[in-house]
Every structure is written in C-alpha cells, then in structure tokens.
Amino acid sequence: MEEMQILVPVAVKSKLTETLKTTLLNEIGQNISRVEHDMAQLEFEANGKLAEQAKINIQAVAPLRAQYEAQKARMQQVKDKLNADKEHLEKLAIGAELNRQPMNRIVTVHVGDDMNALTGGEMLDEDGKIIAFSN
C-alpha cells in the first residue's frame, strides 16, 4: 500500500455580516423562547404531579421536588448560556471572524509525506460563500 486516503479536519470561520448577525440572533432568540416554554411546561407538570403525589405519599414529594428542581436548574443553565452568547454576539463588530463547526476534507497521503503540511487548514466564508483558504 503506497497511498491512503484520510479525513483531515478543517477549521471553518465565518466573517460576521449584518445578515449573519441577524440570523444568529434570531436563532438564539428562538432557542431562548423554547427553553422558557419548556421551563414553564416543567413548572406546570411539576405542580400537578407534586400535588397528586402529596395525596398518595407525602414523603415521596421531597425527592420528586428535588428532581424537578435539578431539571429546572439545568434548563436555567442552558438559558443563561444562550443569553451570554446573545450578549457576546451583540458586542461583536461586523467583520469579526466566528468559529463554526469544523468540516473534514479527504486527503491522499503517500509514504514520505509531511504530515504537518497536511494537517490544519482553515476556510473562511462570508454569507455562505467561501472567500479564502489558508493552511
């Protein structure tokens, strides 16, 4: 075997434009709304189930309440993270580079190739169009 094809990760960055900023802020806003809705739904369900459990076995209420509180705390952490992301994005200047989810590229390697030259790589896009590559 003299050659092999491998997947090499490529960093993807997006240049922040008004369009991208608006899109990302809208996505974050929708996610915050979804989490708030889920938290309200959890509160509603918890109140009903806790009241029902209190009628059956009052001693089982405390562990059940703790479960709901833990789940509510996890949801609050998600909401706090989303709000922090939103604040960070609002402060970013147009033209800033945002790290996005990396992609993979297929590279054919041969015996004796310099692995350092093959790894890495970066791609920059602006409004969905690739504008630059770098290694």
Regions found by a protein language model. Name each.
Residues 1-25:
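Short, charge-rich amphipathic alpha-helices with coiled-coil/heptad character
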Residues 72-122:
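Coiled-coil termination/hinge junctions
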Residues 51-54, 62-80:
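An N-terminal amphipathic alpha-helical segment
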Residues 21, 25-35, 39-42, 68, ...:
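Amphipathic alpha-helical coiled-coil segments
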Residues 133-135:
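Short linear motifs in exposed loops
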Residues 125:
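Short, acidic, Ser/Thr-enriched surface-loop or helix-capping motifs
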Residues 34-61:
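Extended alpha-helical coiled-coil "stalk/arm" regions
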